[in-house]
Curated annotation (Swiss-Prot):
Lineage: Bacteria, Bacillati, Actinomycetota, Actinomycetes, Mycobacteriales
NCBIfam families, A to Z: PRK13203.1, urease_beta
UniProt GO BP: urea catabolic process
Entry keyword NADP: no
Organism: Rhodococcus jostii (strain RHA1)
Top EC class, one word: hydrolase
PANTHER family: UREASE
Record-given protein name: Urease subunit beta
Reaction catalysis annotation: urea + 2 H2O + H(+) = hydrogencarbonate + 2 NH4(+)
Primary subcellular site in the record, as a coarse category: cytoplasm
Amino acid sequence: MIPGEVVCAEGVIELNEGSPRTELEVVNTGDRPVQVGSHVHFPQSNHALQFDRSAAHGLRLDIPAGTAVRFEPGIAQTISLVPLRGTREVHGLSLTPPGKLDAS
């Protein structure tokens, strides 16, 4: 074993296995590229991104942890979203009010 080495199981590892996926078209209406990280509650992403924010409620990008998607100005892009998991609470960013995504 090498310090920091990650040993994965044999075979294919499916990202977000079993999660329902939602596809949305996104257009960056701004004049600069926008990057959105893997665990951002997608409706709270940069307001220059034009997409159906209500359809994206409770969802994040379907990409590996620690990565991001870059949206270039004026280019339409279809993305895949999956539900946020765990406690489904979002603090900070622009959720008004911050906290639970689902009604209790």
